[in-house]
C-alpha cells in the first residue's frame, strides 16, 4: 500500500507517454520527463567538478549582468506585506540575526527548514553584492537543557555542547554556510545583566525575590508584531505562572537560582537569564540596537519576538529592526512538527537514507513562508530530481572537459535566449520574496536542452554544441550555488545518491547486479513474464533498470508499486 501511494503522484506522467519505453535509449532519454529520466553513472572517475560548493558561491555575486537593477522584496511580518529591501546603511553591511537552537536533543527537519531558508537569504543577499553580518545564536542554558541533563545525569553545558556540535555538523551537511558569528548565551551574561539594568532604570521591569519581570503594561506597543491585544496575550511556553507578577503576561528577564541549576551572580542575587532577553542582548552586542533583518520560525512571533521587541525598545528607545522574516512550519499529518509534540523526525535520521541535499531540495520545493507537509514520497521525488540534475551536469562536464572555448565566440541565438531566460526567471523569482520553488523550476528547460544536445542525433549535430553545453552548465551551476545545491563533485554526489538508494531498498549493489543477471538470462530464454517481474520487484523499492546497447544498468528512482505502470520489457 505504501508503494502504491508513492506511485500515485507519478501515474499521470507515466500514462501520458506509454510508448517511450520502446524508443531507443538515447531518444527516450531526451523525451522523458525529468523526474522519470533514466540516468547513467560512469564506471570511471572523470575529473571532479571544477566548482566546489562553497568556493563557487563566494564568486556567485558576479552572476548577474553589471549595472542591472535587482530589487529584492521581502515579506515583513510586522507590516504584513512585501516590502522593498533597503539596507539601513546604503552600501554598508547588512545586519541579520536569526534565532538559533536550544541544543538539548538532535535537531529535526523543522530546524532544517528554518536554517536552510535563512541560508538562502544570506546567499542571495551576497549574490546581490551586499556585505552581510549574519548572527545565529545558541541558547545553551535553558529549562529544557537542564531537564534533559538531569534526566541523563549529565552536566548541562556538556550536553548543550554535544548537541551544538551535532547541529553544526547537520548544517554543514545541508550546505548551510557558517554564520559570521555564533554566540552562546553562557558567554554573554554580562551583556544580558547590563540590558536588564537598563530596562529596570527605564521603569519597564521590576524585581521580586531574586526574579526580574518585564512589565508589559509599561510598554504600550506590546502586541504590534503578533497583532495580539494585551488582554488576549498569554504567557509564553517557557514563562512559568507566578502570582507575584503584576500582569499574567509579564515575562521573566532573570530567574532566581534553584538548587542544582547553573547560576551567575547578579544585582538581584544568583540566577540565570530568561529565554527572551538572551537574543535581545546578543543581537545588540553584535549588530547594534538597530539592524536590518531578524528572522526565525513563525512559532517565534509570539511570545519570543514580541518580547524581544519590548525588551530592546525598553532598554534603548531608538532600537528598531527593519524587517521581521518568518518561515512556515514543517507539518506531519497536518500538525506542526516539534519536539514538544513528539512527532519530529531528526535530520540525522533522514540523512541516513537520503542525501542531505535531497532534503534541502525537498525544503526548497515549497516557498519558505508556506507550510510544508513532510512525506517520504516527496523526499523520493526530490532525490530523483537531484539525481537527474547532477547526472545531466556530469554528462555535460565529461563531454566538455577536453574542449576549450575561444574567447568572444558568439553562441547560437537559441542558446543565448535559453541562458538569458534562466537568468531572468531565477532573479525574478528570488527577488520576489525568495520563491525558491520557481527558481528550481527555471532550470528544467535548460536541463532538457542539454540532454537533447548530449544524447539525441539532432542535438549532436547542432552548431557550437559544446560551447552551448558549457555555457548552460555554468549558468545552472550559478543557480545551484546560490540555492546551496552545488556539490563539490557531481560524480561523487551521484555515487552517494546511489548508495542511499541501495540503503533504502535494503540491497547491496551486488544483489542488484545479480537481479540484472537473472533478468538478462530470462530475456534470453524468452521468459518475459519473469523478466517483467524482476523489473517490477526492483522498481517497487526504487531501483530502475535501463536497457541499452551496452547491456542493462540501474539508477535510483521514485519507488513504484507492483501494480504501478512500469515500462514493459
Curated annotation (Swiss-Prot):
Entry binding sites for ATP: 339
GO cellular component: chloroplast; cytoplasm; mitochondrion
Sequence motif 'KMSKS' region, residues: 336-340
Annotated cofactor note: Binds 1 zinc ion per subunit.
Catalytic activity field: tRNA(Cys) + L-cysteine + ATP = L-cysteinyl-tRNA(Cys) + AMP + diphosphate
Keywords assigned: Aminoacyl-tRNA synthetase, ATP-binding, Chloroplast, Ligase, Metal-binding, Mitochondrion, Nucleotide-binding, Plastid, Protein biosynthesis, Transit peptide, Zinc
Location(s) in or outside the cell: Plastid, Chloroplast; Mitochondrion
Positions annotated to bind Zn(2+): 99, 279, 304, 308
Transit peptide residues according to the UniProt entry: 1-42
Annotated GO MF terms: ATP binding; cysteine-tRNA ligase activity; metal ion binding
Span of the signal peptide: none
InterPro entries, sorted: Cys-tRNA-ligase, Cys-tRNA-synt_Ia_DALR, Cys-tRNA/MSH_ligase, CysS_C, Rossmann-like_a/b/a_fold, tRNA-synt_1_cat_dom, tRNAsynth_Ia_anticodon-bd
Highest rank taxon of the organism: Eukaryota
Enzyme class: ligase
Gene3D superfamilies: Cysteine-tRNA ligase, C-terminal anti-codon recognition domain, HUPs
Residue intervals passing through the bilayer: none
Any matching Pfam family: tRNA-synt_1e
One GO-annotated biological process of the protein: polar nucleus fusion
Obligatory cofactor(s): Zn(2+)
Motif ('HIGH' region): 101-111
Family per record: Belongs to the class-I aminoacyl-tRNA synthetase family.
Function, as annotated: Nuclear genome-encoded factor required for normal assembly of chloroplast polysomes.
Name the UniProt record assigns to this protein: Cysteine--tRNA ligase CPS1 homolog, chloroplastic/mitochondrial
Originating organism: Oryza sativa subsp. japonica (Rice)
Amino acid at each position: 500500500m505504501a508503494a502504491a501511494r508513492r506511485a500515485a503522484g507519478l501515474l499521470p506522467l507515466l500514462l501520458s507517454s506509454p510508448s517511450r519505453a520502446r524508443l531507443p535509449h538515447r531518444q527516450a532519454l531526451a523525451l522523458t520527463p525529468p523526474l522519470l529520466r533514466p540516468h547513467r553513472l560512469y564506471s570511471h572517475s572523470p575529473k571532479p567538478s571544477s566548482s566546489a560548493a562553497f568556493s563557487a558561491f563566494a564568486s556567485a555575486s558576479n552572476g548577474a549582468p553589471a549595472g542591472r537593477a535587482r530589487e529584492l522584496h521581502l515579506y515583513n511580518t510586522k507590516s504584513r506585506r512585501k516590502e522593498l529591501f533597503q539596507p539601513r546603511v546604503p552600501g554598508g553591511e547588512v545586519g541579520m540575526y536569526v534565532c538559533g537552537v536550544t541544543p538539548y536533543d538532535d535537531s529535526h527537519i523543522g530546524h532544517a527548514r528554518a536554517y536552510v531558508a535563512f541560508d538562502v537569504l544570506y546567499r542571495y543577499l551576497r549574490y546581490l553584492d551586499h556585505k552581510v553580518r549574519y548572527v545565529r545564536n545558541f541558547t545553551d542554558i535553558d529549562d529544557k537543557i537542564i531537564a534533559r541533563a538531569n534526566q541523563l545525569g549529565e552536566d548541562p553545558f556538556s550536553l548543550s555542547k554535544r548537541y551544538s556540535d551535532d547541529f553544526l555538523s547537520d548544517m554543514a551537511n545541508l550546505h548551510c554556510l557558517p554564520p559570521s558569528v555564533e554566540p552562546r548565551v553562557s558567554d554573554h551574561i554580562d551583556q544580558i545583566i547590563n540590558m536588564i539594568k537598563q530596562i529596570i532604570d527605564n521603569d519597564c521591569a521590576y524585581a521580586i525575590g531574586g526574579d526580574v519581570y518585564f512589565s508589559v503594561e509599561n510598554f504600550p506597543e506590546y502586541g504590534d508584531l503578533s497583532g495580539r491585544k494585551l488582554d488576549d496575550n498569554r504567557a509564553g511556553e517557557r514563562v512559568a505562572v507566578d502570582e507575584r507578577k503584576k500582569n499574567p503576561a509579564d515575562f521573566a528577564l532573570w530567574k532566581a537560582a534553584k538548587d542544582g541549576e547553573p547560576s551567575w551572580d547578579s544585582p538581584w542575587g544568583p540566577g540565570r537569564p530568561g529565554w527572551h532577553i538572551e537574543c535581545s542582548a546578543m543581537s545588540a552586542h553584535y549588530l547594534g540596537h538597530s539592524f536590518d533583518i531578524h528572522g526565525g520560525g513563525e512559532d517565534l512571533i509570539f511570545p519570543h519576538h514580541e518580547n524581544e521587541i519590548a525588551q530592546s525598545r525598553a532598554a534603548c528607545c531608538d532600537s528598531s529592526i527593519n524587517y521581521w522574516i518568518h518561515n512556515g512550519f514543517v507539518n506531519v499529518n497536518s500538525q506542526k512538527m516539534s519536539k514538544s509534540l513528539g512527532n519530529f523526525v531528526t535530520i540525522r535520521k533522514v540523512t541516513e537514507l537520503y542525501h542531505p541535499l535531497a532534503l534541502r531540495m525537498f525544503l526548497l520545493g515549497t516557498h519558505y513562508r508556506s507550510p510544508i507537509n513532510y512525506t517520504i514520497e516527496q523526499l523520493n521525488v526530490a532525490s530523483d530530481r537531484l539525481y537527474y540534475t547532477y547526472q545531466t551536469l556530469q554528462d555535460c562536464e565529461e563531454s566538455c572537459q577536453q574542449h576549450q572555448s575561444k574567447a568572444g565566440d558568439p553562441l547560437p541565438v537559441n542558446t543565448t535566449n535559453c541562458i538569458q531566460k534562466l537568468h531572468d526567471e531565477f532573479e525574478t523569482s528570488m527577488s520576489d520574496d525568495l520563491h525558491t520553488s520557481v527558481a528550481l523550476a527555471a532550470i528544467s528547460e535548460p536541463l532538457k536542452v542539454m540532454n537533447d544536445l548530449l544524447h539525441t542525433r539532432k542535438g549532436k549535430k547542432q552548431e557550437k554544441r559544446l560551447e552551448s553545453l558549457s555555457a548552460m552548465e555554468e549558468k545552472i551551476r550559478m543557480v545551484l550555488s546560490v540555492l546551496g545545491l552545488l556539490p563539490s563533485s557531481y560524480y561523487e554526489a551521484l555515487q552517494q545518491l546511489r548508495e542511499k538508494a541501495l540503503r533504502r531498498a535494503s540491497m547491496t549493489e551486488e544483489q542488484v547486479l545479480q537481479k540484472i543477471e537473472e533478468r538478462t538470462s530470462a530475456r534470453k530464454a524468452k521468459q518475459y513474464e519473469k523478466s517483467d517481474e524482476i523489473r517490477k520487484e526492483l522498481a517497487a523499492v526504487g531501483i530502475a533498470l535501463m536497457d541499452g546497447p551496452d547491456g542493462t544498468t540501474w539508477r535510483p528512482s521514485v519507488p513504484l508499486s507492483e501494480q504501478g505502470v512500469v515500462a514493459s520489457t
